[in-house]
Structure formats: structure tokens, C-alpha cells
Design a protein with these regions (language model features):
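Hydrophobic h-region of N-terminal signal peptides that target proteins for export
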Residues: 5-6, 10-19
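N-terminal secretory signal peptides that target proteins for export/translocation
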Residues: 1-2
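Subset-of-secretome marker
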Residues: 21-180
């Protein structure tokens, strides 16, 4: 369960634009991210996340390869009108992921991220067959719902199950965890 949660959190964070690639920041407030997966046996997921400018910037830095143990040999951004295309090759935990993402929409109201990726090596991923090369297609439809709700703090992610996880707290726990 914990591993599945980490994957969902990573996927949700992946919807954020990568700061190193100079993509627009998302509007602060409460965002809903609806994710569908092809090529992995995972059900659709819906997550709500409360953002402020600082949290969005931190999430973007983590996704763009600035996180510990992540090395990206390629990160390229191209723009054509309102469409952004990001191509990357990154390695972490012994896995190499080659991704092609197309982002359309507005980071103030609603956007869609369409990602195709190929993963080789590394530990097995939830919902994927063990070993070999895995191809997947993930679509993330994000929409701004309004201000964060009373009692929410920046970094709160409300999972489809209703459980709330704070990405900042999760990051601190992962940094404090003993290395294997």
C-alpha cells in the first residue's frame, strides 16, 4: 500500500511542470488531477492537491530531476502556440525512463498532460509485469477548483480514498528514512 501511494504521489507530482524547463507555474489553490493509465494494471486515480507558489516550485524541481538520485541525460522543451512538448531521459533507482509529454491548456484553470514512456531496469513498478521493458501511456486532466479549503495547507494531497498526505511531510520522511 505504501509503495502504491508513493507511485500515485509521484504521478500526481509529475503533472506539475518542470521548473528546470521553465514551464509556467500553476495557479495557487486547490487542483484536481484525474489520471488514467494504459499499459499498467492501475485503476484511474483522482487526487486533489493544495498548492501555493513555493510548493509548486518545489514539486516542479523534484520532477525535473533535481531530486536526490535522479539523473537526466535529456530534458528538452519545445513550444508551438499553447502546446508544450517535453522529451526526457532520466535514470533513478537503476531504472531508465524515456518520456514524451504533451501539455495543453492553461496553468490558471485547466490543462492536460499526455505522457508516453518506456521504462527499463530498476525495481518492479505497481501495476506492471515484472522484468523487461515497460511501455505506458498516462493522461492527466487537471483543473483548478478554487482556493484551498479551510484547514488545508500547501502540499496537502487528498487521495481518492479520502486519505490526506502532505507532499512536504512525505519528502521529509523519505529523506530521514534509512538507506537500503
Amino acid at each position: 500500500m505504501r509503495r502504491h501511494l508513493a507511485v500515485i504521489v509521484f504521478i500526481a507530482v509529475s503533472a506539475a511542470p518542470a521548473a528546470a524547463l521553465d514551464l509556467p507555474a500553476r495557479k495557487p489553490g486547490l487542483w484536481q488531477l484525474d489520471m488514467t493509465f494504459v499499459g499498467r494494471k492501475l485503476p484511474p486515480q483522482s487526487i486533489k492537491e493544495c498548492l501555493d507558489a513555493a510548493t509548486d516550485k518545489l514539486m516542479n524541481a523534484n520532477v525535473s530531476g533535481a531530486g536526490a538520485g535522479v539523473t537526466c541525460s535529456k530534458q528538452e522543451l519545445s513550444r508551438s502556440g499553447a502546446t508544450l512538448t517535453v522529451d526526457s531521459v532520466c535514470t533513478a533507482n537503476g531504472a531508465t525512463v524515456t518520456s514524451h509529454a504533451v501539455v495543453t491548456g492553461s496553468f490558471d484553470s485547466a490543462y492536460t498532460v499526455d505522457v508516453t514512456s518506456t521504462r527499463t531496469g530498476g525495481p518492479p513498478m505497481p501495476g506492471a509485469a515484472p522484468g523487461g521493458t515497460h511501455e505506458s501511456h498516462t493522461t492527466i486532466a487537471a483543473k483548478w477548483l478554487g482556493p484551498c479549503q479551510p484547514g488545508q495547507r500547501a502540499g496537502d494531497m487528498i487521495m481518492g480514498s479520502g486519505r490526506t498526505v502532505n507532499i512536504l511531510d512525505l519528502q521529509k520522511q523519505m529523506q530521514a528514512a534509512p538507506k537500503r
